[in-house]
């Protein structure tokens, strides 16, 4: 065995003239048989060198572990200069949204705070600590935040338009199945947020985005503590900008914290109203202060009579439940989601064409409601469903049949009455003529006698 080892060492050129092994390689030769375990003793490096290698490996492992984890809010902060801010998309009371670049397209919301106090900055980071844990198909993905040059939230970029834009600007022609599915996906996303103890506080059609495949993405949620701690002027602007979706208790602002799961439910009820009517509530009132006063006092509610006639009754009942004036009487999103899913299962199904794209990647692809198909929330229904024009036509035909039936039944009686009246008139006229003749004869007789 010893002779074999010496031959192997000689082949590698590591044996010195004096028979020492000072030039031995740190790795065993590839041809070394696996049974020669005694070679391991010859491969040992000096003690100090081995310790340095072990220390370096430990540091590398710690560094990789740090890079692989983002456990604190500070790990999600994007350094100044890494985000390229591009086109301005829109603005609100709380901030302005831009399209930006950061490892791809992102949405950057610059908050309306120029010099936050340490308390505000800490509140902002605390809220970010909640947002970074959200992962759902119907929620805009939180990607990070920045504090310089100003506070900003970075989320995924959604290729598509808001639900508000679809319903009230370009009037996208949705079928009823898609309107119901938009409601289902929105309820699904809100149910997830509430399960995470996140209150949206500003749910409205402007903050519900439809991706290219009509997947709902809810945005602009969270930051509740930040919104409540910043100046009252910002709160007032937010109130005036979103009053159509605000619950009565939020408008009154009598409670210390009027926002709750139920206030989000009320806002969802207004979104349902938009979906099922194609209109905004209180469109006949132009005075914003009047709306604030009447809704806050409980004198005004959305007019559910404007809901389309082809809207399922279960959806209309759910809408009325969500819009209850008393907070405790409204359902919560687990119940809402279950109701919408039950409604979807109870309606008729048809098979889709293989070439037709799926409605969304979260499921709900096979169900279609031909009886509830409509061209647009604002236009009459086209082929494929019973439209308003067909209802009016049917009513007209029924009314015509009733009139004809009345004429057939009543015409003989009417003719008889008319004929009898005419006969009486003739008889009366003849009687008057006879009496007139008698009077004439009676008048002539005295003259003859004279």
Curated annotation (Swiss-Prot):
Residues 1-80 are annotated as: Disordered. The keyword Membrane does not apply. It comes from the Viruses. Pfam families: PK_Tyr_Ser-Thr. GO terms for molecular function: ATP binding; protein serine kinase activity; protein serine/threonine kinase activity. This protein is synthesized as a Rmil-Env polyprotein. Belongs to the protein kinase superfamily. TKL Ser/Thr protein kinase family. RAF subfamily. This is Serine/threonine-protein kinase-transforming protein Rmil. It comes from Avian rous-associated virus type 1.
């Amino acid at each position: 065995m010893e002779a074999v080892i010496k031959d192997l060492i000689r082949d590698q050129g590591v044996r010195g003239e004096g028979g020492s092994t000072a030039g031995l390689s740190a790795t065993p030769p590839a041809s070394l048989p696996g049974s020669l375990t005694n070679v391991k003793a010859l491969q040992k490096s000096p003690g100090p060198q081995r310790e340095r290698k072990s220390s370096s490996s430990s540091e590398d492992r710690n560094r990789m572990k740090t890079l692989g984890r983002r456990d604190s809010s500070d790990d999600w902060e994007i350094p100044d200069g890494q985000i390229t801010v591009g086109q301005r998309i829109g603005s609100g009371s709380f901030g302005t949204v831009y399209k930006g670049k950061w490892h791809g397209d992102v949405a950057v919301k610059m908050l309306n705070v120029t010099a936050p106090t340490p308390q505000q900055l800490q509140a902002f980071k605390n809220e970010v600590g909640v947002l970074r844990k959200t992962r759902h198909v119907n929620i805009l993905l939180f990607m990070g935040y920045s504090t310089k040059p100003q506070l900003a939230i970075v989320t995924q970029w959604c290729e598509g338009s808001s639900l508000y834009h679809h319903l009230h600007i370009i009037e996208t022609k949705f079928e009823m199945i898609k309107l119901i599915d938009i409601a289902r996906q929105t309820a699904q996303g809100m149910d997830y947020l509430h399960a995470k103890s996140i209150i949206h506080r500003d749910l409205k059609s402007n903050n519900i985005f439809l991706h290219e495949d009509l997947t709902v993405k809810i945005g602009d949620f969270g930051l509740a503590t930040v919104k409540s701690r910043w100046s009252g002027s910002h709160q007032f602007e937010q109130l005036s900008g979103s009053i159509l979706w605000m619950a009565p208790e939020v408008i009154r602002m009598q409670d210390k914290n009027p926002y709750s799961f139920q206030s989000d439910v009320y806002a969802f009820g207004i979104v349902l109203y938009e979906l099922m009517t194609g209109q905004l509530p209180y469109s006949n009132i132009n005075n914003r202060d009047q709306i604030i006063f009447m809704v806050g006092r409980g004198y005004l509610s959305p007019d559910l009579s404007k809901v389309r006639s082809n809207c399922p009754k279960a959806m209309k009942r759910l809408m009325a439940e969500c819009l209850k004036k008393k907070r405790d009487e409204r359902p919560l999103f687990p119940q809402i989601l279950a109701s919408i899913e039950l409604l979807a299962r109870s309606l008729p199904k048809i098979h889709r064409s293989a070439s037709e794209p799926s409605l969304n990647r979260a499921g709900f692809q096979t169900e279609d409601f031909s009886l509830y198909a409509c061209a647009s929330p604002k236009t009459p229904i086209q082929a494929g469903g019973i439209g308003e024009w067909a209802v009016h036509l049917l009513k007209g035909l029924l009314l015509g049949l009733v009139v004809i039936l009345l004429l057939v039944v009543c015409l003989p009686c009417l003719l008889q009455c008319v004929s009898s009246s005419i006969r009486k008139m003739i008889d009366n006229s003849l009687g008057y003529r006879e009496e007139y003749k008698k009077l004439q004869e009676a008048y002539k007789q005295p003259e003859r006698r004279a």
